[in-house]
Amino acid sequence: LFRSTADEFAKIYNDFGYEEALDRDPASLSYTYDLGPDMRLLMLDSCQYSPVNKVGGMIKTETYDWIDDQLEKAWEDGVILLPVAHHNLLDESKIYVEDCTIEHSEELVDRLEEEDIPLFLSGHLHVQHYMRDEEDRGIYEIVTSSLSTPPCQYGVLEYRDDETFSYHTQKVDMEKWARKHKSTDENLLNFNTYAPAALKTIFYNQSYDAMKDSEEEETGDIFVKLTKSQKEQMSEVY
């Protein structure tokens, strides 16, 4: 899907949101969807695919006008608006800020906080994490796990009648599934041991590639001189 055009993407996911969209942004792939009588999803297209696909995220200038309209409609309809985007709203990553955080995200933060929107869901990193815009005020952001990434968990979000919310994760028991389906794959049968090591290797390789491709020659030299223990510690920073 990384090489898909905007039109192709909308066609691929037609049965997973677009066909039942309440409203569509004419300038992007953003749309709204009524999850229930009191809950509306604001699905924001933060991807950059024109003229070329980019890793980093951005909300188009024209889309902000559409967002303002949706904020007003949600208030008029008396529904809770839950914004969702692929890229992160806040600086969730320590080393991948440029690739993960939406460009000029403060503009989006200001709009959402003006309307007292309490929560924003995102992915991209897909490392289960949450933070708040400011320590004692502002919007919360939850970076949701990827079900395909160890420890293979999904999020359960509950909105209460008093307009507060709770969120927790639920792990998928891969070892139980493997036994039930009589799998012979040792990695699945011993998933709780295999998964952490596999994920650590992924993060290590990502960190290595980021340093290796750095324009600063000194960065590459530093990596070469790191001990095995230091490199393993680096793989845990994301």
Language-model segments: residues:
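His/acidic metal-ligating clusters that form di-metal
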Residues: 40-42, 54-140, 224, 238
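Extended active-site neighborhood of metal-dependent phosphoesterases/phosphodiesterases
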Residues: 1-65, 165
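Short strand-connecting beta-turns/loops that link adjacent beta-strands
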Residues: 36-38, 76, 135-136, 149, ...
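Extracytoplasmic/secreted cell-surface and envelope-processing proteins
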Residues: 52, 92-93, 130-131, 150-152, ...
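Composition- and surface-driven signal marking solvent-exposed, interaction-prone regions
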Residues: 55-57, 156, 170
